[in-house]
Structure formats: structure tokens, C-alpha cells
């Protein structure tokens, strides 16, 4: 694919389209990158920003070929390709007054995984395992382990639901 990852339906594909800055939660992602790459995931990143985050993603794309796709530029067309092809969309923002990316991911049927702040809290309804409602997954505290746990939880629900996907909004 254009993203430099082999097509693998068994891998949970997580997209990130963002300015690579602290505000957007990249210190949390940086802290968990090695653990994240031990999971059965593929991570596709698109964006530019702070040099340390640009270099971090380049490093992990080199370290985990086929798992991490680092696209350190911005392309509107590619952003739509990512929204359309990923299983989940990660936005662990420290603060996010409004946030458009989670709305785009919802429009494409890609599960948002967000931190409960500002516009993210207002627009993503957390999954409720008891009645199967919700539009995505969220975590409360600005904490890397909480984010990681939420990603793993989203993966397990996603695979459980994939069998009877037609019957649920998720």
C-alpha cells in the first residue's frame, strides 16, 4: 500500500493525523511506543511538528518495519486514506478545544481512541460494554498507561465485535 505496510487484516491498524506536539499527547505515545509495537498493531502517522517527535517516528519506522509507517509531511489526500483504512484513530490530546480529526474518523467509521478533554469529550461517546452503545473509546487522565490500556481494550472489543459487526454501531 502507499503507507508502506503490508495489508494484514489480523493487525489492528491505528491512525494518527496530527501536528506532532506535546499538546496533542505525543509524549504519551513516545513513552509507550515499544510496548505498542509488541501488540498486533500497525501504526500510521501523518504530520509534522516538533523535531523530537518527527525523529521518534522515523526511528520506530526503521526499528519496526511493516508495523510503523512514519509520514512526516502533510497531505490532505493521504489523511483521508488513513481515516478510511484504519481500524482506530488515536488522539490522546492534553487539551483540544474543538478537534476535527475525531469527527472525520467517526464519519469514516474508524473508532476514535481519545482522551476526555474539550471537544473530544463532547463528541466521542465512550463504549458501554453492558448495552453495546458508544462511538469510540476514551480515557480520563493524562497518563501513558491509561492510554495503552484503552488501546488494548479497544482492540479486544473490536475483534469481539468484528464477528457480529452488523448488529452494533461499534
PLM regions and their residue ranges:
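Nucleotide-activated donor-binding/catalytic signature segment of Leloir-type glycosyltransferases, i.e.
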Residues: 7, 40, 44-81, 138
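A conserved mid-protein helix/loop that constitutes part of the nucleotide-sugar donor-binding site
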Residues: 21-34
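Conserved small/polar residues in nucleotide/adenosyl-binding loops
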Residues: 168-170
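A structural motif in glycosyltransferase catalytic domains
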Residues: 14, 29-32, 43
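Catalytic binding pocket for nucleotide-activated donors in carbohydrate/polymer assembly enzymes
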Residues: 81-166
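Cofactor-binding loop segments of dinucleotide-utilizing enzymes, especially the Rossmann-like FAD-
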Residues: 19, 46-48, 73, 115-117, ...
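Conserved donor-binding/catalytic core segment of Leloir-type glycosyltransferases
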Residues: 8-23
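Donor nucleotide-sugar binding/catalytic pocket of nucleotide-sugar-dependent glycosyltransferases
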Residues: 1-8
Amino acid at each position: 500500500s502507499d503507507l508502506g505496510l503490508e495489508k494484514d487484516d489480523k493487525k489492528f491498524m491505528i491512525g494518527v493525523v496530527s501536528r506532532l506536539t506535546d499538546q496533542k499527547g505525543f509524549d504519551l505515545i513516545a513513552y509507550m511506543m515499544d510496548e505498542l509495537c509488541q501488540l498486533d498493531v500497525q501504526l500510521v502517522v501523518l504530520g509534522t511538528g516538533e523535531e523530537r517527535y518527527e525523529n521518534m517516528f522515523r526511528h520506530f519506522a526503521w526499528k519496526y518495519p511493516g508495523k510503523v509507517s512514519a509520514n512526516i509531511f502533510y497531505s490532505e489526500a493521504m489523511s483521508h486514506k488513513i481515516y478510511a483504512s484504519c481500524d482506530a484513530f488515536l488522539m490522546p490530546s492534553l487539551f483540544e478545544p474543538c478537534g476535527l480529526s475525531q469527527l472525520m474518523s467517526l464519519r469514516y467509521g474508524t473508532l476514535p481512541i481519545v482522551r476526555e478533554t474539550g471537544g473530544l469529550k463532547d463528541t466521542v461517546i465512550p463504549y458501554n460494554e453492558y448495552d453495546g452503545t458508544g462511538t469510540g473509546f476514551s480515557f480520563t487522565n493524562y497518563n501513558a498507561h491509561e492510554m495503552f490500556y484503552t488501546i488494548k481494550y479497544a482492540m479486544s472489543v473490536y475483534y469481539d465485535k468484528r464477528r457480529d459487526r452488523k448488529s452494533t454501531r461499534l
